[in-house]
């Protein structure tokens, strides 16, 4: 659009709408002092993106006024149903307004007026003077103002909307939008509309009649009696709703020169960015300096970072480590795969003030030792358990070294794992972030020295720059260790660290080193079948819709929307102003499947296509060419509840057969090594057993002590029948409620999930708590505990801070409540599994068994076992895992064995 880039365009930002969207667009973000700033950061980022993209000469920030507006005079209940804003929102607004003042953005607000009306009024005044206006907003109300000189830019969809785009999306002209909302209403603003008329009904009426007046003059032409009756009975509400929705003009007498904006003032916000700790925004301003002009950590603090390039210096360093018996170690690789990428150097620190980098894989180095020289010298030190090692993300470095035949012994601390325990969810735990947070010592990032300098990999770096970066890694790790150790003790989490999280590093290291075998021949057979099935589904769809659509992309929501809603004339389920495509998510397709066979086929096609693209095609690319196995990564720091997460690839998410691909058996491609079988050890209903123990609900505890089927027992009470008379469908409902109660089950969610009336779902939940009353009491106690401390703790002491627990906003409080309850139960269950893995790993070695834990899938372990050790291993597994704690609620482990993963899948 030519007018958008013209100097005759004024950008008007809906500040109030932006503020709320910015608040919810990011996870909570805080300064070191705990001040929430995510709305400020997100708001500024959105402004920056817009300024960079459009380089506006005129820019204005428009705000709603405080208190009542003229619409409240017309309708006192206007916006009455809105939740209280988050408690920290308005403090963040003050920072945003300060930012706008610093960079010279004019801010406009007027008592009794809303931002929408002010923007409309400014735009109309500009229009008279031949100027164009762009409303920067996602507010649907503003569509009514669209004209040749007024356009909307939705920053969240990165999309311009003019009158033509609007009419294409909505199916009627801009001038009819107030008519449309007179019928539909707006729940967010408590504008009533005409009850009983939804989006489709409103659209049909607006397309049939010219205006609200025309509609009421010709009510007899409304075909549906129910709709006609609703219109007759709610005429007053319809006209009121239109009045509330209409934008109104208010004189402002603003001079155009007051709206000018100079992009060069951006640097004025630097002190604010520094105060709020917006490091990326600070670096954006300061980072324009060449790296050589930026102060190095070694210069800033007077540290000495040395490069080791002679055998004499290497021998002297090894001697120092041998004498001190403690060392911080880091590795430098040419990539992120420790079992494949080339090791190019070691980073060493023995005492604060001096650190070393030993390069041996830098391609442009004039002089460096060989890899063999360095590793041969260091191997005796690295495998010596009496020499204490401190690392940051130890598992990665241990894998990098085992790739060269060195198994590290003597690890005593991992700063990454410690930091994850003691920090809040919003805090970053990378070494650079920890150095700046705890030591106030900024370090160069990988991007600073490699990516931004035009290098492709670490081994390309010149030695002096590599030394500054790498030696600082080991140096700061050594400095952080006593600080983080003390913080663990202070927060009562040292026992958790020492008994669970730290020893788990070795277990996960061994699992990742071992890897798992993938039979690509089986995968190719599955691929052949899936490819055939996809082709057949597409052919079937073509038969149903006609050959002219045979080239349609079934993975394109836009093309599918056109097919379903324009060609097949199926009713749109989700479509809002400003979207360029129809919603075709699985919920929509399942609803449409009752009206036409094509949507059901599309659901099946999508599931098969995802199976092929995400698993069948992708998994072989992860096979290590040296080992012939897949080595996934297990993270202890990715999930706030403490659960382990698998990535590269995610092997916790390998699907079992579904209704859409029965018989494909993707898991059958995963096999144990020759002579072994797979043993699955699965904790039965572990989270429910945790719930029973933590709540000490008598009925729940007794059910597990008696070995009853807990789902059948729950269902019997729900349906007022005996346990013997519970049918399968009833048990499924009992199961659904049992497992969902810890995830904040609501009547609405249950009714939607089970496709039952809301009132029935509400009764089921009430009966559940009547059956297990102590569960409700326990949940209340968790909320009280969280409110008292600001955090919830698991049974073993892991903390999770939940600031939303103090919210007056019901939506935010309910979310915080669910998080607190779920963290207590899921986090405790995760710790039981971790403790079980640690104890089992020790027991297998103690019994001289050759079984290896390969995977952890949340409540289940996949173990490779020699066939001649199967019976003994199974006994050890059950004995260890079932007795990991001494509770009055038994832990039960079910075991299965088979020749591939599919055979042991339930």
List the predicted regions and their residue ranges:
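Non-catalytic nucleic-acid-binding/docking modules located in mid-to-C-terminal regions
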Residues: 4-7, 56-60, 97, 105-106, ...
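Noncatalytic, basic helical substrate-engagement surface that gates or grips nucleic-acid strands
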Residues: 2-136, 140-162, 237-253, 258-260, ...
């Amino acid at each position: 659009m030519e007018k958008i880039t013209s100097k005759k365009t004024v950008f008007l930002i809906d500040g109030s709408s932006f503020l709320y969207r910015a608040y919810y667009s990011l996870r909570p973000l805080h300064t070191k002092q705990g001040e929430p700033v995510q709305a400020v950061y997100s708001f500024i980022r959105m402004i920056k993106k817009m300024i960079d993209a459009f380089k506006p000469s005129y820019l204005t920030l428009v705000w709603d006024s405080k208190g009542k507006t003229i619409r409240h005079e017309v309708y006192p209940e206007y916006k009455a149903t809105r939740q209280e804003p988050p408690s920290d929102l308005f403090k963040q607004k003050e920072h945003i307004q300060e930012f706008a003042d610093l960079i010279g953005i004019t801010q406009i607000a007027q008592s009794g007026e809303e931002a929408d009306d002010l923007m409309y009024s400014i735009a109309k005044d500009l229009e008279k003077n031949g100027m164009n206006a762009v409303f920067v907003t996602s507010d649907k109300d503003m569509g009514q103002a669209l004209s040749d000189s007024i356009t909307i830019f939705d920053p969240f969809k990165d999309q311009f909307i003019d009158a033509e785009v609007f009419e294409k999306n909505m199916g009627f002209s801009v001038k009819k939008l107030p008519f449309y909302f007179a019928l539909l209403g707006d729940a967010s603003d408590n504008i009533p509309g005409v009850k009983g008329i939804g989006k489709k009904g409103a659209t049909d009426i607006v397309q049939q009649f010219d205006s609200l007046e025309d509609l009421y003059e010709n009510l007899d032409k409304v075909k549906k009696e129910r709709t006609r009756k609703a219109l007759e009975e709610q005429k007053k509400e319809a006209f009121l709703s239109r009045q509330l929705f209409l934008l109104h003009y208010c004189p402002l007498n603003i001079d155009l020169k007051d709206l000018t904006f100079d992009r060069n003032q951006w640097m004025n916000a630097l002190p604010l960015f520094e105060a709020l700790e917006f490091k990326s925004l600070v670096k954006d301003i300061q980072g324009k300096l060449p790296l050589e002009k930026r102060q190095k950590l070694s210069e800033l603090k007077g540290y000495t970072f040395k490069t080791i390039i002679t055998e004499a210096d290497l021998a002297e360093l090894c001697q120092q480590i041998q004498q001190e018996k403690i060392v911080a170690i880091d590795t430098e690789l040419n990539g992120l795969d420790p079992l494949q990428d080339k090791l190019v150097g070691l980073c060493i620190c023995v005492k604060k003030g001096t650190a070393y980098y030993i390069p041996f894989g830098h391609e442009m180095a004039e002089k460096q030792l060989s890899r063999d020289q360095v590793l041969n010298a260091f191997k005796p030190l690295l495998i010596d358990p009496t020499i204490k090692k401190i690392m940051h993300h130890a598992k990665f470095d241990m894998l990098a070294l085992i790739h060269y035949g060195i198994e590290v012994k003597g690890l005593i601390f991992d700063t990454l794992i410690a930091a994850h325990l003691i920090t809040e969810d919003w805090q970053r735990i990378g070494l650079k972030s920890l150095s700046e947070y705890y030591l106030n010592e900024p370090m160069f990032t990988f991007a600073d020295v490699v990516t931004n300098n035009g290098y492709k990999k670490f081994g390309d770096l010149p030695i002096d720059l590599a030394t500054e970066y790498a030696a600082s890694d080991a140096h700061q790790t050594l400095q952080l260790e006593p600080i983080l150790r003390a913080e663990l003790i202070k927060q009562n989490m040292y026992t958790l660290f020492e008994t669970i999280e730290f020893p788990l590093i070795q277990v996960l290291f061994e699992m990742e080193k071992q890897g798992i075998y993938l039979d690509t021949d089986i995968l190719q057979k599955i691929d052949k079948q899936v490819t055939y099935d996809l082709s057949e589904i597409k052919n079937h769809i073509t038969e149903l819709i006609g050959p002219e659509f045979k080239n349609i992309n079934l993975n394109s929501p836009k093309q599918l929307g056109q097919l379903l809603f324009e060609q097949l004339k199926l009713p749109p389920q989700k479509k809002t102003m400003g979207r360029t495509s129809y919603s075709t998510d699985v919920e929509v397709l399942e609803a449409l499947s009752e009206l036409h066979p094509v949507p059901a086929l599309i659901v099946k096609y999508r599931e098969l296509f995802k199976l092929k693209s995400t698993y069948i095609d992708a998994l072989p690319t992860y096979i290590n060419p040296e080992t012939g196995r897949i080595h996934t990564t297990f993270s202890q720091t990715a999930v706030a509840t403490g659960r382990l997460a698998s990535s590269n690839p995610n092997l916790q998410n390998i699907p079992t057969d579904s209704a859409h691909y029965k018989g494909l058996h993707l898991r059958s491609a995963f096999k144990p090594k020759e002579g072994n079988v797979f043993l699955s050890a699965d904790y039965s209903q572990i989270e429910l057993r945790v719930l029973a123990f933590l709540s000490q609900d008598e009925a729940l505890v007794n059910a597990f002590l008696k070995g009853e089927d807990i789902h059948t027992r729950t269902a019997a009470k729900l349906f007022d029948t005996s346990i013997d008379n519970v049918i399968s469908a009833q048990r499924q409902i009992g199961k659904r409620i049992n497992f969902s109660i810890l995830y904040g089950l609501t009547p609405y969610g249950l009714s939607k999930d089970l496709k039952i009336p809301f009132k029935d779902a509400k009764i089921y939940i009430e009966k559940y708590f009547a059956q297990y009353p102590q569960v409700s009491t326990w949940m209340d106690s968790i909320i009280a505990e969280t409110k008292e401390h600001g955090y919830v703790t698991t049974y073993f002491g892991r903390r999770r801070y939940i600031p939303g627990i103090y919210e007056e906003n019901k939506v935010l409080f309910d979310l915080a409540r669910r998080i607190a309850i779920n963290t207590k139960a899921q986090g405790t269950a995760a710790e039981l599994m971790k403790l079980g893995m640690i104890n089992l790993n020790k027991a297998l070695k103690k019994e001289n068994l050759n079984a290896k834990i390969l995977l952890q899938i949340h409540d289940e372990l996949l173990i490779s076992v020699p066939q001649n050790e199967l019976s003994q291993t199974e006994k050890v597994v059950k004995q260890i895992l079932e007795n990991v704690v001494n509770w009055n609620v038994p832990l039960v482990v079910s075991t299965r064995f088979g020749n591939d993963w599919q055979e042991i899948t339930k």
